[in-house]
Amino acid sequence: MGSNSSRIGDLPKNQYLKKLSGTESISENDPFWNQLLSFSFPAPTSSTELKLLEEATISVCRSLVENNPRTGNLGALIKVFLSRTKELKLSAECQNHIFIWQTHNALFIICCLLKVFICQMSEEELQLHFTYEEKSPGNYSSDSEDLLEELLCCLMQLITDIPLLDITYEISVEAISTMVVFLSCQLFHKEVLRQSISHKYLMRGPCLPYTSKLVKTLLYNFIRQEKPPPPGAHVFPQQSDGGGLLYGLASGVATGLWTVFTLGGVGSKVAASPELSSPLANQSLLLLLVLANLTDASDAPNPYRQAIMSFKNTQDSSPFPPLIPHAFQINFNSLYTALCEQQTSDQATLLLYTLLHQNSNIRTYMLARTDMENLVLPILEILYHVEERNSHHVYMALIILLILTEDDGFNRSIHEVILKNITWYSERVLTEISLGSLLILVVIRTIQYNMTRTRDKYLHTNCLAALANMSAQFRSLHQYAAQRIISLFSLLSKKHNKVLEQATQSLRGSLSSNDVPLPDYAQDLNVIEEVIRMMLEIINSCLTNSLHHNPNLVYALLYKRDLFEQFRTHPSFQDIMQNIDLVITFFSSRLLQAGAELSVERVLEIIKQGVVALPKDRLKKFPELKFKYVEEEQPEEFFIPYVWSLVYNSAVGLYWNPQDIQLFTMDSD
């Protein structure tokens, strides 16, 4: 580094880095800093190069760790950066490319060093390196600066206050990355951290007043999806001056500095993937999720979560309730549009879940939208391609549907939205179908996939809960959706019979041999019977509440009437079978009277006529099916590892050695 283009492999031998990490103290006013920060660094373009950068940084850090307690050079570098950021806003307004470029380079070095420090040492050691203060002879003051706190406040100020221009885009991304790196101490602990330097600095003291402004800025960065400026927008004039400063950065920018924005961290995702078309938006979203999922401090709730829970629409002129901390306003229409467009990434789906679950203002706004298909369709597409998604992404998508189906208005309106030609649904050509029927099809497909592959009870529960919430409001079900409901019941029935047979054989086997351990078929039977009962309750709920709206379901029920015969006298299902049995018997009688060889159209006509004559008072009333999503106790045990796995896999230009990661296993999704 310094006044030449640098290559990763040369970093440990670089004279400027050697001096920085050496035994000589460097004053913050030394011309050395201008030389160190005037580098054209071809930024890593693959995970291999990011790994090389990490290894080179470790080499420099070893010397720095050894010498910094005596030299204080890390503190001097940070002070140089802090002093420069005071003029950054003015430099942006004056288009001072050189000043911004050097300030960015200072932050880039700090970020690289901080990342290794956090991985390699305890929080106590880290703080010692950031609180060094040179004392003159006879000065016994114990007041030392806390440069880590100053750095964090400065980063928050930079992120929130510096205008986003072509020349400031890069330093804005670097500031967000450095905050992510500061929080990354969680990666190196198996247990969720409940007390750390993150809590110390970000939840109290001078950083706290920036909370709402930071959350708002990160959300707007996500909303705007600003792309990095083209290479030509950031070219510096070539000068050959005797001072050795390198002002000719054109080649470095074109081939290097901007390419950092096409990286996806480990695995190096291709630049064309949607979440990386805007590195600033991607990095902002990851930082926002990390902040929102920090555990509460011992003496105060997480202020970033408070901000996310309470912000309002810019169109809402009502006053904020008293005692609401960190409140702000944001354009809900823009946020809704961005959320609809970005659902291909885990992190955008997790943000949608977080907002729907925690912010009642957002939830009310979304449920009142007349274009809910723009939000629901991307969620259904995630579930449809379940085999290509990780299980966490599928869970989030399902829970979003469950939260939406808690609202009766949503359950009614989705059957009024008619869709044409759903191209991603490949099992059958759907030229025209309601959003409600499509939702049913996709959820049932997810259940069937789970039954044959993952066999996850939690997934089953959420799918069935969403269907149950909707069931009383089923309207004009598409014939294919009606068929799939009964087909799922058929599949469950076959599975029940198979497990019952296995249980019987197992019981016989246990009587003849006491030595061999046998599978717990009784538990399997119990689970499958719970699911069957739930399906019967869903069918019953539709028949008792909206029979006249669903001739296709009655048709499918009659077509497969034999399926239900075995459950009529079963003690677990007798009560719920009464209404289904009544409907089957009533309409079967009508069809019998109409004669044989009836066309599909004629059968549907008889069903529609029969609905009017069916004595509704004979249908037994059951409690309304209503399920509400409730987060499990200690949700942070799920969400914190999940969020950090997203950072690990998706953060732009950040690499961590997988062998150092303690929070989650590398093969987990």
UniProtKB/Swiss-Prot annotation:
Pfam families: Dymeclin. One of its GO terms (cellular component) is Golgi apparatus. It comes from the Eukaryota. It is a lipid-anchor. Coiled coil: none annotated. InterPro entries: Dymeclin. It is found in: Cytoplasm; Golgi apparatus; Membrane. A lipid is attached at G2 (N-myristoyl glycine). Necessary for correct organization of Golgi apparatus. Involved in bone development. Interacts with GOLM1 and PPIB. This is Dymeclin. It comes from Pongo abelii. The lineage of its organism: Eukaryota, Metazoa, Chordata, Craniata, Vertebrata.
